[in-house]
Structures are given as C-alpha cells and as structure tokens.
C-alpha cells in the first residue's frame, strides 16, 4: 500500500492526537505523563509552523498512520542550524515503512532549509528506534543517565546526530 507524505493540516490533529497520546500513556517515546488535549496539540503544531518548521503526516488509504516534524534543538541563536526531530507511527503500523518515509522527507526538508545537523533524542531502551536511526546515518553522540523518570523508573536518553550535506 502506498504511503503518502504530506504537510500537516489542522483537521489532521485529532488523528495525530490518538497516536501521540498512545505513545505518552504506553511508551517511553515521550517523557510526558499526561495525555494532551486537542487544543494543546494544535498549539504545538501552530508554533512549529509559524517558525518555519515542517510538520508532516503519513497517510495510507486516506487514514493518518504517522507524523513527524523538526524544530529548534535549543533556543539560543547559535543553534539555528541544528534541529531536533521526532517521528511517530500508529501502533498498528510500526515496522511498515511509515517511519522510513517520514524521516526520509524530514531529512530532505532539513537539507532544503540549509540546516547543518539533525538531532534525535531517544530513550535508551528503544533499541528499535536507535537501530532505525543508524540506518539513516545517525550516530550515537551522547548518553545522559537518568534524564527522565516515568513508569516508576529512571530513563536514560541517547542523543543521535546526522550531519547534513
């Protein structure tokens, strides 16, 4: 089945909210504790778009099956050529090429925007995501012990980086 990657539209947000809230409640993909509201998620995306960052949607059979974006890595001016990205697939579509299609397009958009490097911050237990990023040329460049606390345990963050050409 064909995967269509396109720019986010406001009416996509409720489908995206289902994906992100599932990740919040059932995984360490996000270090949030509480589900997001539709209004708060819309606000997050509006802010990214207003700053010129892409928010992308993966669609298959007219259904949203994933999304991704990049935005500031840090808020100091000297970091303006570095972005942090995130990619999420619906739990029923993991391992089916959704993340690959999204990350491929995000890397292309980052290059078009003349970014120098992309950063991914991944929970250390998420070895599938770490291996996935390595396939795209990301390298492990940092490890922060006990940087988060969720599900009654300390979590460690792996920083992965891809230099763009």
Annotate each language-model stretch with its function.
Residues 17-46:
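Conserved GNAT-fold acetyl-CoA-binding loop/helix
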Residues 95-108, 131-135:
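Conserved acetyl-CoA-binding loop-helix of GNAT-fold acetyltransferases
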């Amino acid at each position: 089945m064909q995967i269509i990657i396109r720019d986010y539209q406001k009416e996509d947000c409720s489908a995206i909210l289902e994906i992100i809230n599932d990740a919040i409640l059932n995984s360490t993909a996000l270090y949030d504790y509480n589900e997001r509201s539709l209004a708060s998620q819309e606000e997050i995306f509006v802010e990214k778009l207003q700053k010129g960052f892409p928010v992308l949607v993966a669609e298959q059979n007219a259904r949203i099956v994933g999304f991704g974006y990049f935005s500031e890595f840090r808020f100091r001016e000297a970091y303006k050529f570095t972005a942090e990205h995130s990619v999420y697939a619906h739990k029923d579509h993991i391992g089916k090429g959704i993340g690959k299609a999204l990350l491929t397009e995000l890397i292309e958009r980052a290059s078009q925007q003349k970014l120098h490097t992309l950063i991914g911050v991944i929970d250390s237990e998420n070895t599938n995501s770490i291996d996935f990023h390595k396939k795209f040329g990301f390298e492990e460049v940092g490890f922060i012990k006990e940087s988060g606390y969720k599900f009654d345990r300390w979590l460690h963050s792996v920083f992965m980086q891809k230099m763009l050409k």
